[in-house]
Amino acid sequence: MANSKSAKKRALQSEKRRQHNASRRSMLRSYVKKVIAAINAGDHKAATEAFNAAQPIVDRMATKGLIHKNKAARQKSRLNTKIKALAA
């Protein structure tokens, strides 16, 4: 347990940030799951729309440091490849 005043403050800040990050991570996963669901359904139009909505969210979370920028790029690339395969 935190003993000093500054340690208590850091513990409170850490918990607040943990909850905020958990909320953002959940939102990110929800957007990606919508894209995957549309791909699995075989609906190219819905998958494209869901991807267009998810793309800025993924980028924003990478900018905020929630996920690594390479992970964001990899996620977007793999989803886009699957969407293009639907059109073919």
Swiss-Prot record:
GO terms for molecular function: small ribosomal subunit rRNA binding; structural constituent of ribosome. InterPro entries: Ribosomal_bS20 (IPR002583), Ribosomal_bS20_sf (IPR036510). Transmembrane segments: none annotated. Keywords: Ribonucleoprotein, Ribosomal protein, RNA-binding, rRNA-binding. GO terms for biological process: translation. Residues 1-27 are annotated as: Disordered. The keyword S-adenosyl-L-methionine does not apply. It comes from the Bacteria. The keyword DNA-binding does not apply. One of its GO terms (cellular component) is small ribosomal subunit. NCBIfam families: S20 (TIGR00029). Belongs to the bacterial ribosomal protein bS20 family. Binds directly to 16S ribosomal RNA. This is Small ribosomal subunit protein bS20. It comes from Shewanella sediminis (strain HAW-EB3).
